[in-house]
Amino acid sequence: MQNYEYQVCSVQYGRVTFINGAWRGNVPVGGDTNASLESCPNVWEYLQEAGREGWELVSVITHPQERPDAALDMLYLKRPSW
Protein backbone atom coordinates (compact mmCIF):
# COMPACT_ATOMS: atom_id res chain seq x y z
CA MET A 1 0.00 0.00 0.00
CA GLN A 2 1.28 3.47 -0.92
CA ASN A 3 1.94 5.91 1.92
CA TYR A 4 2.00 9.69 1.54
CA GLU A 5 3.56 12.76 3.13
CA TYR A 6 1.41 15.88 3.44
CA GLN A 7 1.92 19.62 3.57
CA VAL A 8 -0.63 22.14 4.81
CA CYS A 9 0.33 25.63 3.65
CA SER A 10 -1.14 28.94 4.83
CA VAL A 11 -1.26 31.67 2.18
CA GLN A 12 -1.77 35.33 3.05
CA TYR A 13 -1.63 38.16 0.51
CA GLY A 14 -0.23 35.78 -2.12
CA ARG A 15 2.63 34.57 0.10
CA VAL A 16 3.15 31.12 1.61
CA THR A 17 3.56 32.06 5.27
CA PHE A 18 3.42 28.74 7.15
CA ILE A 19 3.94 25.11 6.14
CA ASN A 20 2.79 22.52 8.66
CA GLY A 21 2.87 25.26 11.29
CA ALA A 22 6.44 26.42 10.58
CA TRP A 23 7.14 30.02 9.48
CA ARG A 24 8.52 30.22 5.90
CA GLY A 25 9.82 33.78 5.89
CA ASN A 26 13.44 34.87 6.10
CA VAL A 27 12.48 37.74 8.44
CA PRO A 28 11.10 36.70 11.85
CA VAL A 29 7.40 37.12 12.58
CA GLY A 30 6.69 40.27 14.56
CA GLY A 31 8.17 43.71 14.28
CA ASP A 32 7.73 44.91 10.71
CA THR A 33 4.77 42.90 9.42
CA ASN A 34 5.27 43.96 5.79
CA ALA A 35 8.93 42.95 5.80
CA SER A 36 8.06 39.60 7.40
CA LEU A 37 5.36 38.91 4.81
CA GLU A 38 7.54 40.00 1.87
CA SER A 39 10.24 37.57 3.00
CA CYS A 40 7.91 34.60 2.38
CA PRO A 41 7.84 32.86 -1.01
CA ASN A 42 5.05 33.86 -3.37
CA VAL A 43 2.57 31.12 -4.20
CA TRP A 44 3.68 30.62 -7.81
CA GLU A 45 7.36 30.21 -6.90
CA TYR A 46 6.55 27.92 -4.00
CA LEU A 47 4.32 25.63 -6.09
CA GLN A 48 6.96 25.44 -8.85
CA GLU A 49 9.60 24.38 -6.32
CA ALA A 50 7.26 21.95 -4.55
CA GLY A 51 6.29 20.34 -7.87
CA ARG A 52 9.96 19.75 -8.72
CA GLU A 53 10.27 18.00 -5.33
CA GLY A 54 7.38 15.65 -6.15
CA TRP A 55 4.57 17.47 -4.30
CA GLU A 56 1.11 17.54 -5.87
CA LEU A 57 -1.49 20.19 -5.01
CA VAL A 58 -4.65 18.27 -4.10
CA SER A 59 -6.92 20.94 -2.59
CA VAL A 60 -7.30 24.65 -1.86
CA ILE A 61 -9.67 26.12 0.70
CA THR A 62 -10.28 29.87 0.98
CA HIS A 63 -11.33 31.37 4.30
CA PRO A 64 -12.88 34.76 3.46
CA GLN A 65 -12.06 37.75 5.65
CA GLU A 66 -13.72 41.15 5.99
CA ARG A 67 -11.22 42.56 3.50
CA PRO A 68 -11.30 40.50 0.28
CA ASP A 69 -7.55 40.97 -0.29
CA ALA A 70 -6.87 39.53 3.19
CA ALA A 71 -8.42 36.11 2.52
CA LEU A 72 -6.57 33.18 4.04
CA ASP A 73 -6.00 30.29 1.64
CA MET A 74 -4.98 26.83 2.75
CA LEU A 75 -3.10 24.67 0.23
CA TYR A 76 -2.99 20.92 0.71
CA LEU A 77 -0.19 18.99 -1.01
CA LYS A 78 0.86 15.35 -0.97
CA ARG A 79 3.63 13.15 -2.34
CA PRO A 80 4.49 9.49 -2.03
CA SER A 81 6.61 8.61 1.01
CA TRP A 82 10.03 7.36 -0.01
Regions found by a protein language model. Name each.
Residues 1-82:
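Terminus-proximal functional modules
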